[in-house]
């Protein structure tokens, strides 16, 4: 009889211990009620949407809603989303309540490449290739004889320069590369082509071009010349 009483007391103690554990740790019994998805930089990039994030998680059987909070693996969520070529960084965490937060930072393109060899892709701020997909943002387009190595070593610095300068970001809409690797710029304002030659000392060349715009074209008109050559230092050659 004493042994039975001891056994009952032991079972009761274990039960009470588990009950206290569950009570003090609501995650064990609580289920996820909502997933809050935040996609940063949506105003300047539109490669991925919150709906697409949710779809990826559902297809991977990782969608948290309805799952016990204790069973939700945020590290696995981040791992799966990191495979998407348009995502740069992911942070996922559980709240003290019943929500899961997923914050995604998109890769930001600086240029679209449409090469004569058939390549069609974007390059991001780090110079990494991004596959061509639906995207409507106003980016400079580079055309012509462009290999991936040329795009990374020569065009990426130009793309960054244009992207982070408000004037040039608004002014230049296309870059063309000829078979010798020489570069032409096509502006939005002005009926002319800007020839810069080999893509070296581009910062200095654009500085001279900007001064020429202000001091000359503002006086004679932006459609005065059909070609503006800024290849060589200390001179600008114009053709009507």
Could you describe each region identified by the protein language model?
Residues 1-67:
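N-terminal membrane-targeting segments
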Residues 39-41, 104-108, 134, 143-144, ...:
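Flexible glycine-/small-residue-rich
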Residues 42-83, 131-160, 197, 207, ...:
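Periplasmic/extracytosolic POTRA-like scaffold domains at the N-termini of outer-membrane
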Residues 44, 88-89, 99, 108-111, ...:
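Short beta-strands and strand-coil junctions in structured, solvent-facing domains, enriched
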Residues 82-98:
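Short, well-structured beta-strand/strand-turn elements
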Residues 103-179:
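Extracytoplasmic segments of membrane-associated envelope/inner-membrane machinery
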Residues 196-240:
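Extracytoplasmic/luminal low-complexity segments enriched in Pro/Gly and acidic/polar residues
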């Amino acid at each position: 009889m004493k042994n039975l009483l001891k056994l009952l007391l032991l079972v009761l103690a274990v039960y009470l211990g588990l009950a206290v554990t569950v009570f003090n740790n609501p995650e064990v019994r609580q289920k996820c009620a909502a997933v809050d998805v935040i996609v940063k930089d949506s105003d300047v990039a539109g490669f991925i949407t919150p709906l697409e994030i949710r779809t990826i998680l559902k297809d991977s059987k990782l969608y948290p809603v309805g799952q016990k909070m204790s069973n939700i693996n945020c590290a696995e969520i981040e791992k799966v989303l990191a495979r998407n070529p348009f995502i740069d960084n992911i942070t996922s965490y559980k709240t003290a309540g019943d929500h899961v937060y997923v914050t995604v930072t998109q890769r930001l393109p600086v240029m679209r490449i449409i090469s004569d060899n058939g390549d069609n892709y974007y390059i991001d701020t780090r110079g990494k290739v991004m596959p061509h997909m639906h995207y409507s943002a106003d980016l400079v387009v580079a055309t012509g004889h462009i290999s991936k190595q040329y795009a990374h070593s020569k065009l990426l610095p130009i793309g960054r320069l244009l992207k982070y300068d408000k004037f040039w970001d608004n002014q230049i809409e296309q870059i063309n590369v000829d078979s010798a690797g020489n570069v032409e710029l096509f502006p939005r304002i002005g009926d002319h082509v800007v020839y810069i030659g080999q893509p070296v000392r581009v910062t200095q060349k654009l500085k001279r071009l900007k001064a020429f715009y202000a001091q000359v074209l503002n006086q004679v008109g932006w459609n005065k010349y059909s070609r503006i050559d800024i290849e060589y230092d200390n001179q600008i050659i114009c053709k009507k």
